[in-house]
From Swiss-Prot:
The active site is at residues 79, 188, 190. Its EC number is 4.3.2.10, 3.5.1.2. One of its GO terms (cellular component) is cytoplasm. InterPro entries: Class_I_gatase-like, GATASE, Imidazole-glycPsynth_HisH. This is Imidazole glycerol phosphate synthase subunit HisH. NCBIfam families: IMP_synth_hisH (TIGR01855). Residues 1-213 form the Glutamine amidotransferase type-1 domain. Heterodimer of HisH and HisF. PROSITE patterns: GATASE_TYPE_1. SUPFAM superfamilies: Class I glutamine amidotransferase-like. It comes from Salinibacter ruber (strain DSM 13855 / M31). Keywords: Amino-acid biosynthesis, Cytoplasm, Glutamine amidotransferase, Histidine biosynthesis, Hydrolase, Lyase. The keyword Lyase applies. One of its GO terms (molecular function) is lyase activity.
Length: 218
């Protein structure tokens, strides 16, 4: 069972439908106990970093999220949900994230002052993801699959080992991150056609406990 965390922000039906398309059993919940005990978790996210993390905390979901990650539950953050995995977000201020992965989230033009003007922000549309290593999450997606992005901010990972794929847009940024049982994708898999569905199918097939050899500190 794949559980989608419902914290009241965004249209969750699209990601839910994408999982159903690949044959996964999926449901949504905002119940802290159900999240803490889930077999597999997805944290979607759209909009502003602060609004998302504030709502997660208002609903007392941060603790259950950490509990589930600590149990080895496969966990996937999508778009802003991926950004929330990092320590700090700098969208309209400085905001504390979930702190699962070391690093921060910054605006494209703040991380690259020399970014060409013809590259508009937000980064919107299809772009390639370049794997840094093999992983079951990326199985059968092709050497450089194209996926769909809509974002103005991106993570800056402190640990290069956490970066599973990179994407170039003015500069190179992490587009998929992974540490043990924790995964994050900056793009929208539910909008990324075959590559996106393939990634969700791979995630749904991951074992409950990842044998990655690195421990996530929560």
């Amino acid at each position: 069972m794949t559980t989608i965390i419902d914290y009241g922000i965004g249209n969750l039906r699209s990601i839910e439908k994408a999982f159903e398309t690949v044959g996964a059993t999926v449901h949504r919940t905002d119940d802290p106990a159900a999240i803490a005990e889930a077999e597999r978790l997805v944290l979607p996210g759209v909009g502003a970093f602060r609004a998302c993390i504030d709502e997660i905390r208002r609903r007392d979901l941060e603790g259950p999220i950490h509990d589930a990650i600590g149990r080895g539950v496969p966990f996937l953050g999508v778009c802003v949900g991926m950004q929330l995995l990092f320590e700090t977000g700098y969208e309209k201020g400085e905001h504390e994230g979930l702190g699962v992965l070391p690093g921060h989230v910054a605006h494209f033009r703040e991380t690259d002052a020399g970014m060409p003007d013809e590259l508009t922000v937000p980064h919107m549309g299809w772009n390639a993801i370049e794997p840094t290593r093999d992983h079951p999450l990326l199985d059968e997606l092709g050497a450089t699959p194209y996926v769909y992005f809509v974002h103005s901010y991106h993570p800056v990972a402190e640990d290069a080992d956490d970066v599973l794929t990179t994407t170039s847009y003015g500069h190179t940024f992490p587009s998929v991150v992974q540490r043990d049982n924790v995964f994050g994708v900056q793009f929208h898999p539910e909008k990324s056609q075959a590559a996106g569905l393939g990634l969700l199918d791979n995630f749904a097939a991951l074992p409950t406990t990842e044998e990655a050899g690195r421990t996530v500190s929560t």
